[in-house]
């Protein structure tokens, strides 16, 4: 064999198996997918105004494509159900926060409780896989 890959890769100064490295990368990809998931509803919201319609549509499609790409990368090394649940959780909670901070969405105790339940569910999925 001309090219041989070591079964161990360094990560942050410590040895880590390829499986551990792939798992860490899949969680990074999933986190990025979740962040990009926040962008497409923002793009749709921006497109509601006539003067920013095409900009908003371009933002929405760009973020959808990036979110899908990173979700695809994440699912190569983790269960589909876990990836999808975490992806939608990050997207939902992040979109809620952006809506409250930048678009004047209502902030109530019940809505905060709902987002906290999403975040807790995502944490449980993270630690169970």
Residue map of PLM features:
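Polytopic alpha-helical membrane proteins, predominantly small-molecule transporters/carriers
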Residues: 3, 17-129
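Intrinsic disorder/low-complexity segments
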Residues: 6-10
């Amino acid at each position: 064999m001309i090219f041989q890959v070591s079964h161990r890769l360094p990560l942050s100064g410590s040895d880590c198996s390829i499986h551990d490295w792939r798992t860490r990368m899949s969680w990074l990809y999933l986190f990025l997918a979740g962040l990009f998931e926040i962008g497409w509803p923002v793009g749709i919201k921006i497109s509601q105004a006539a003067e920013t319609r095409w900009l908003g549509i371009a933002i929405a499609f760009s973020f959808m494509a990036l979110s899908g790409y990173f979700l695809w990368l994440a699912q190569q090394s983790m269960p589909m159900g876990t990836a999808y649940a975490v992806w939608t959780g990050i997207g939902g909670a992040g979109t809620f926060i952006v809506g409250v901070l930048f678009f004047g969405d209502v902030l109530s105790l019940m809505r905060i409780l709902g987002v906290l339940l999403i975040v807790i569910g995502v944490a449980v999925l993270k630690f169970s896989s």
